[in-house]
């Protein structure tokens, strides 16, 4: 059964381009193209699409307002088409908080290779969105959430442990939820979230505002500090290396690994090699299998491994692959994951 797709964009060029890409795939059926939210509403009611690609910046009714109304009236898998501006990035994360499944930047097609790569990516995201679990809508929190009482971590744990997290589709909101449940005093945390360039800095700034931790986009060669969270920049691999007695970041522009740059496998492999048994790692919602190999190495080196449970995942791809490998010690739904990780870290002071 084909996946019914509706394209909503005020640009005729973008509509036709996306329509051309969708019609070239036998698994997808283009049921309509709308230039504004009013046309889109009629087409949603008429065609009942499985997936909608939605432009954020539209006349009359903007994409966020339409998305908000859609998710209340007829929840549907939505992939946002986002501009590479700071305002566009902010709007994108608001859209994900409102219930959009995923996003992709507007196409910049300067060569046939660009066209082919963009087509592969948008088709992959549409197909993944069609099978995604739509979460209950929740507005982006406006204030820092104060977590309930958490176990105190010893200074030894804070200064010797490393926490590593990997995610893809659905990960921006999952990471926010997880970090909001962590206390202000934690070991260094390194995160790879599949995301294109131009969005990771805004993502880090958003997390910094909405959690008790210090969150930043990682820079090359910086020392990892307790109470800080380091986000892999878009289109760069984030690795952790040990220099003297300190953990430091290394950013590289190497080939894609497991189909991605940044890659969760690259981060997890590096953490396993330099932190070994002092690693606590979690793999969250996402499509594909990136992170499974890295989790296997962390397990082999004696680290503690966690995976998000299927019920709370938007896409149960990456956690499933790691679980299938037999390298995950604890499978935990997102609401309980922070407590499980903290209880493990707190238990280390008694060892």
Swiss-Prot record:
PTM note: Phosphorylated by CheA. Phosphorylation of the N-terminal regulatory domain activates the methylesterase activity.
Localization, UniProt: Cytoplasm
Catalytic activity as recorded in UniProt: [protein]-L-glutamate 5-O-methyl ester + H2O = L-glutamyl-[protein] + methanol + H(+); L-glutaminyl-[protein] + H2O = L-glutamyl-[protein] + NH4(+)
Enzyme Commission identifier(s): 3.1.1.61, 3.5.1.44
GO MF terms, alphabetically ordered: phosphorelay response regulator activity; protein-glutamate methylesterase activity; protein-glutamine glutaminase activity
One GO term of the biological process aspect: chemotaxis
CDD domains xrefs: CheB_Rec, REC_CheB-like
Domain CheB-type methylesterase span(s) in chain numbering: 156-348
Keyword Disulfide bond: no
Domain Response regulatory: 4-121
Modified residues (4-aspartylphosphate): 55
Enzyme active site: 168, 194, 290
Organism superkingdom: Bacteria
One GO CC term, this protein: cytoplasm
Top enzyme category: hydrolase
Cross-referenced InterPro entries: CheB-like, CheB_C, CheY-like_superfamily, Sig_transdc_resp-reg_Me-estase, Sig_transdc_resp-reg_receiver
Keywords of this entry: Chemotaxis, Cytoplasm, Hydrolase, Phosphoprotein
PROSITE patterns in the record: CHEB, RESPONSE_REGULATORY
HAMAP family per record: CheB_chemtxs
Protein family: Belongs to the CheB family.
Function: Involved in chemotaxis. Part of a chemotaxis signal transduction system that modulates chemotaxis in response to various stimuli. Catalyzes the demethylation of specific methylglutamate residues introduced into the chemoreceptors (methyl-accepting chemotaxis proteins or MCP) by CheR. Also mediates the irreversible deamidation of specific glutamine residues to glutamic acid.
Comment block on domains: Contains a C-terminal catalytic domain, and an N-terminal region which modulates catalytic activity.
Protein name: Protein-glutamate methylesterase/protein-glutamine glutaminase 2
Source organism: Shewanella sp. (strain MR-4)
Gene name for this UniProt entry: cheB2
